[in-house]
Amino acid sequence: MLRIYAPASSANISVGFDTLGAAISPIDGSLLGDVVQIEDIPAGFELESAGYFVRKLPKEPQKNIVYQAYVLFSERLKLRNGHVKPLRLTLEKNMPIGSGLGSSACSIVAALVALNMFHNEPFSKMELLEMMGELEGRISGSIHYDNVAPCYLGGVQLMVQSLGNICQQLPFFDSWYWVLAYPGIEVSTAEARAILPKSYTRQDVIAHGRHLGSFVHACHTQQDVLAALMMKDVIAEPYRESLLPNFAEVKQASRDLGALATGISGSGPTIFSIAPDLAVATKLANYLENHYLQNNEGFVHICKVDNQGTRALG
């Protein structure tokens, strides 16, 4: 039996729409992510679901993304004259769906890594990552890797999609704390994509290029002040903020409390605030708990970048 944990991820990081993503873990050691357990059975295939958010999963097993991961893995293995073993997959759904924290990516990545390890790793990391992107595209409507890549590989990942690589890891800032606030409401990725304009002004395109280029440069040269200043979003945030509760007010208040940057995590409704130290992070967490959460399913976590990525649990 194997138990595979896949951590939450924050895509875009404001400045890198569909291009940047970070794996995230709470500093208190709690597991913010999904777990997939895989084990032998005498014959056939079984899928079970558990976890806090299990009630949010599709009722039909065929619509469960873990089932779809199993089917895709089986198809790819057959192309290599291989066959899947009789097995049971159990998804522990600990991540809220439509949260902006890579919930679907957690399930996809944990399932595919579990299946690959269970079958003695017939697929390389890049082959698995390509499968992960394909499955993610079925949910959101377009293939993108900014959640699955950091969730799988850890760290902050830049999508390059050239020279045989889907992504490359960016050096980042170990001193930064990420305060993540999920309000307890759902925003579908497809809905959040549909709200974006079909085209952008030249001014916005230039600004986006300047911000992203400067941010990547700042990461490589370890200029934390410049990196934080460049965490601006002219592509998605102006259009998506209407889907989030009191976003403009919360963003300004977070800045007043000492946040280096605040933005939408993925397609929302989770937001993130970057804090320079734990004292500021604690202030931000307290504020967001009282002013951003909408119901008792919401939560706030003080986090750091998770450099391990997906891993087996003991």
Curated annotation (Swiss-Prot):
GO terms for cellular component: cytoplasm. It catalyses: L-homoserine + ATP = O-phospho-L-homoserine + ADP + H(+). This is Homoserine kinase. NCBIfam families: PRK01212.1-4, thrB. GO terms for molecular function: ATP binding; homoserine kinase activity. Its EC number is 2.7.1.39. Keywords: Amino-acid biosynthesis, ATP-binding, Cytoplasm, Kinase, Nucleotide-binding, Threonine biosynthesis, Transferase. ATP binds at P96, I97, G98, S99, G100, L101, G102, S103, S104, A105, C106. Pathway: Amino-acid biosynthesis; L-threonine biosynthesis; L-threonine from L-aspartate: step 4/5. Belongs to the GHMP kinase family. Homoserine kinase subfamily. Catalyzes the ATP-dependent phosphorylation of L-homoserine to L-homoserine phosphate. Its main location: cytoplasm. The gene is thrB. It comes from Mannheimia succiniciproducens (strain KCTC 0769BP / MBEL55E). Coiled coil: none annotated. The lineage of its organism: Bacteria, Pseudomonadati, Pseudomonadota, Gammaproteobacteria, Pasteurellales. GO terms for biological process: threonine biosynthetic process. It is found in: Cytoplasm. The keyword Transferase applies.
